Amino acid sequence: ADVALLMDGNKADMLLTDPPYNVDYIGKASELETKKIENDKMEDSAFQDFLTSAFSNAEENMKAGGVFYIWHAEIEGLNFRAACKKAGFQVRQCLIWNKNSMVMGRQDYQWKHEPCLYGWKDGASHLWASDRKQTTVLDFDKPQKNNLHPTMKPIKLFDYQIKNNTKGDDIVLDLFGGSGTTIMAAEQNGRRGFVMEYDPKFVDVIVDRWEQFTGMKAKKIKE
């Protein structure tokens, strides 16, 4: 119902989203105190149900042929793929974001990449607006600062994905707004960003970021 309210009868041309990874990530103490991510520590079956519900809502509000990009954690790949299948999304490829530096952790091999599931809704052909030289490895630098959100993505990365599969004033949907990278990338390409975020702290981050970028004032339509 919330997604239908957001869309108001519109259908999305793309889903570009970065859901919680279910890894109980908490940012460093030196970063903003808002660094805890909601719904990031759930039992296996509950997490898959959570994702399935979100993806099903997205699928219902997308055009046939609409492309999806779903970022996720490698260790939760099975749950993400299973949720996609249950929601009616057919994963066609898995893209890899190759970062310019690793992320320090406690595991034997330090993480230097993040995967992204790519595909499109059945029922129509999808739009591919780029050339035939693009590969499944995406080389983009990490944001220099992660002070807005612990898993913040660079605008250039989402800008690249939006350019590859949308045109004009197409609608880009994101059900996990986070730091607002999707709406920022949509804005600078003239696309219409339809974004949801559960945590009020990050809603404020998104609004502030958009206002600074556009020089405009956000309007609250209703409580």
Language-model segments: what does each one mean?
Residues 1-203:
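Core catalytic lobe of class I
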